[in-house]
């Protein structure tokens, strides 16, 4: 293999640039040319493809976002769109592709594999919802962003004797809510993977009020429901002054943490190794601090699981 491509797709996550850097540098180290595909699968279809050199990835390891830009592309979900993408890859002489992104990005990579084109997926999403890896690129940075925000919100909550409902990202996964809630001592954590009873949540808050507790923090994953709705019901049923904060896209931005930079570097370099070894249709990951790879179809078919022991611990500590 003498020429490979790399693209980022779907929602951006801090550390994607570090992964791009690792792909480019590892490939060039092995004498392989690298082409960057801009705007994800949309850029693949349109042919927005440019050769990358060592200088192309200079001074980006610390930057959030992605220098290749990203986009969601409905056209690539069609057979015609996939054929256009493969035609562009052949036109540029690209023999293998590294795809950095989440499950939607991996679904696109799987389609390329089915058409006989070698791909390797690198998990990049703040949701940490990709099976086959303990952590995804960007999760640790987003977690620290959320923790910092909750720390600041708790300061004002204690000053005004208020209950705060904080909605964090996590459409189908509660990792951000669980980890940040546990780290910040939240009184209640609401995630998609665990049943929640609003009556029990209200009772817990009322017990706290009865023993003199003046403020509370409730962390809600967006996939469970609207933080605004939670806040409204809590205010109506407890009489507590309640405020709602939706953290939104601030969770995706910022300079990646050291952990995410190292993780992205390891996964990006491993993706190149796998392509050069002749592997195709796989994803890279890290399990027990060891680099691993799994069949991409298997990864897409598996359901994300959360550490329910950690969830139970959060409940035990928030009595």
From Swiss-Prot:
It is an enzyme of class 2 (transferase). Pathway: Carbohydrate degradation; glycolysis; D-glyceraldehyde 3-phosphate and glycerone phosphate from D-glucose: step 3/4. The gene is pfkA. It holds the Pfam family PFK. This is ATP-dependent 6-phosphofructokinase. It comes from Halalkalibacterium halodurans (strain ATCC BAA-125 / DSM 18197 / FERM 7344 / JCM 9153 / C-125). One of its GO terms (cellular component) is 6-phosphofructokinase complex. Catalyzes the phosphorylation of D-fructose 6-phosphate to fructose 1,6-bisphosphate by ATP, the first committing step of glycolysis. Substrate binds at residues 125-127, 162, 169-171, 222, 243, 249-252. Its cofactor is Mg(2+).
């Amino acid at each position: 293999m003498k020429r490979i491509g790399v693209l980022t797709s779907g929602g951006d996550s801090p550390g994607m640039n570090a992964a791009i850097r690792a792909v480019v540098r590892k490939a060039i180290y092995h004498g392989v040319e690298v082409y960057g595909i801009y705007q994800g699968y949309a850029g693949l279809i349109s042919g927005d493809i440019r050769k990358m050199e060592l200088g192309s990835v200079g001074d980006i390891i610390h930057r959030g976002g992605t220098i290749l830009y990203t986009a969601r592309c409905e056209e690539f979900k069609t057979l015609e769109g996939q054929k256009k993408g493969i035609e562009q890859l052949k036109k540029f002489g690209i023999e293998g592709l590294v795809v950095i992104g989440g499950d939607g990005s991996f679904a696109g990579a799987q389609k390329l594999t089915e058409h006989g084109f070698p791909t390797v997926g690198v998990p990049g999403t703040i949701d940490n919802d990709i099976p086959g890896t303990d952590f995804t690129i960007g999760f640790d940075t987003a977690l620290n962003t959320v923790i910092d925000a909750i720390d600041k919100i708790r300061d004002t909550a204690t000053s005004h004797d208020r209950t705060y409902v904080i909605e964090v990202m996590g459409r189908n996964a509660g990792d951000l809510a669980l980890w940040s809630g546990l780290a910040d001592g939240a009184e209640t954590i609401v995630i998609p993977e665990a049943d929640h009873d609003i009556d029990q949540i209200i009772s817990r808050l009322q017990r706290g009020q009865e023993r003199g507790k003046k403020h509370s923090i409730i962390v809600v994953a967006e996939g469970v429901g609207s933080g605004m709705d939670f806040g409204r019901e809590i205010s109506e049923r407890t009489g507590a002054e309640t405020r709602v904060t939706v953290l939104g896209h601030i969770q995706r931005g910022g300079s990646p943490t050291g952990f995410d930079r190292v993780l992205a570097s390891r996964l990006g370099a491993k993706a190149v190794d796998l392509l050069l070894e002749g592997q195709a249709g796989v994803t890279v990951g890290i399990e027990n601090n060891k680099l691993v790879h799994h069949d991409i179809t298997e990864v897409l078919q598996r359901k994300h699981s959360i550490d329910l022991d950690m969830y139970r611990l959060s409940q035990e500590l928030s009595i």
